[in-house]
Amino acid sequence: MLKVVRLGSPVALVIALAAIASAQTDDLAEKLKTLPHVKEVRQTPGGASYDISFEQPVDHTKPQGQKFLQHLFLAPTAYDQPVILGTEGYAANRPGGGELRRMLGTPNLLTVEHRYFGHSIPAPLDWKYLTIKNAADDMHEIVTAFKKLYKGKWIATGASKGGQTALFFKCYYPDDVDATVSYVAPINIGQEDPRINYFMETVGDQATRDKIKAFQIALLKHEDEIIPLLNVDPKNYSMGVAKAYEYGVLEFPYGFWQYGTKPETLPNPDASTAELAAEYKKVNTMYYYSDPGIHQFEAFMYQAFTEIGYYNYDIADFKPYLKANPNPTNMDLCPAGTKDKIVYNPETLAFVFHYLQYNAQNVVFIYGETDAWSATQMQLIGRTNAIKIVVKGAWHNANVRAASLEQQDLFYSTMEKWLGMNLFRT
């Protein structure tokens, strides 16, 4: 599962922004209301940021058609300061900024909730308008409007699916921002990209991979004994608890590598069922197959199987033990009523991949060495000025601070050249 990654500490963010909020005029809320498509402006408790409703077409090819309100979060500093454009891939509930906020000193933070997530869901809901292009058009409308107020440098950034959002935006609107920093964002080239399974067969060392597989087989062999120990509510599993359990076992290695689990924590296959259950619960991959989990990520799964791409499971070693789920497919996680109608569009990511390799300027790609999603990291061929940093030993938490000093120097010198300003080294 492509996880939600949040950028920045909310406590530190509120303190920092409260201290500099006076740098903008008291009538900012009124100015925001004059921007095109801004429908509501609500100041958050404490007054450090604004929750903004921005009207968007559901289908940007029909701008006069159905509309919906997209939620934005603005933490302002000054009109001439840089703007960090946080491109969320999921829901959002506050301004972000992450490590870039510290590097840029006192930037404005503008975070955009992705369409079809959180409070930014059209009604009535038609899934066919949840496309990469429509989401990029959303970003373009927002940037165009807010540039009427904010004249400094603009930097788009996001992590995981949010990093994908930043990259897709770059491909369709290359001149809207001055730089793009994408964290741990895969660029898949198929509905079920085979490179991900190959990565899972080679990541780490053989001993660790063997231990993970033995653990999975033990979980399946003792399924009937372990499920009662999980204390799950069957009412939350419409697909059936046993089927969800087996999905969670198949998903386990992806969660293991994505979140940097230590192999020494894995029980031996002959451990007690209580020990096996405890470790399985710790990674919690079964949640994604519960009704709340499916609902939370259904929009992502729709995107995955129509445009963004995902992965399948190599079940060769597990097939004898899959009693409730003999033919697993993650399309089971797509929105109700869409599974049999989904058609994958290979042209979208083919365009994105080609554009990023041959045309995209001022882009930083950051990946973690052992992150499962590094399997489909962007491959650069030297045709643009883009740089890529793969952080040794890092997983889905990879960032510049964890990179080597040489990699940090490359990042800072490159960004300073692109932005024409000095960055604070954190």
Located regions from the model:
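Alpha/beta-hydrolase active-site loop
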Residues: 129-148
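C-terminal subdomain of alpha/beta-hydrolase-fold enzymes, centered on the catalytic histidine
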Residues: 258-426
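Bacterial Sec-dependent N-terminal signal peptides
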Residues: 1-26, 200-211, 426
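Conserved alpha/beta-hydrolase
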Residues: 104-122
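Gly/Ala-rich beta-loop-alpha elbow adjacent to hydrolase catalytic centers
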Residues: 158-162, 166, 170
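Alpha/beta-hydrolase
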Residues: 168-302
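Alpha/beta-hydrolase fold nucleophile elbow
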Residues: 150-160
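Catalytic-loop region of hydrolases
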Residues: 23-108, 413, 417-426
